[in-house]
A protein has these predicted regions:
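Short, C-terminally biased terminal segments at protein or domain edges
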Residues: 1-135
């Protein structure tokens, strides 16, 4: 395949297209009347669409926003797979979740790389006071 757009060069984009192909095969045998069928189809489609749109944005804030939406869609797909297993529509979803784990990890990397504008807080000890603090 000849690369025509910058987002097509991203490994995470290619992996998300691979996941869509995996989902298409999976959904072939699942009743279209199940809401989770449509939800998984839409959420899986949302991943590469948001990666492509985010990669085309000019500001880091915009790029991160779309990459974060794509990450959320990947997590939504993982939950859809759990629902399909719970409803005994599929026996297991390990191979799909492995693809999703790679997608999420790559998106987190992209978000961290482009999020120079974000303020990162160190974890705080909420609700407890250190001995002698403020006494």
């Amino acid at each position: 395949m000849k690369v025509a757009f910058d987002h097509e060069k991203l490994d995470v984009y290619q992996e998300s297209i691979r996941f869509i192909c995996w989902v298409d095969e999976l959904l072939h045998d699942i009743p279209k009347t199940l809401a989770v069928n449509n939800q998984l189809d839409r959420a899986s489609t949302s991943i590469p669409l948001n990666i492509a749109e985010g990669n085309g944005k000019y500001t880091d804030a915009d790029r991160c926003r779309f990459f974060d939406i794509a990450r959320g869609s990947a997590l939504e797909c993982a939950a859809c797979l759990d629902v399909l297993v719970a409803r005994k529509q599929i026996k297991q979803a390990d191979s799909g979740k492995e693809i999703l784990a790679r997608i999420v990890a790559m998106l987190v990397g992209l978000i961290r790389h482009t999020s120079s504008y974000r303020v990162h807080e160190q974890s705080a000890d909420c609700g407890t006071r250190a001995a002698g603090a403020g006494d």
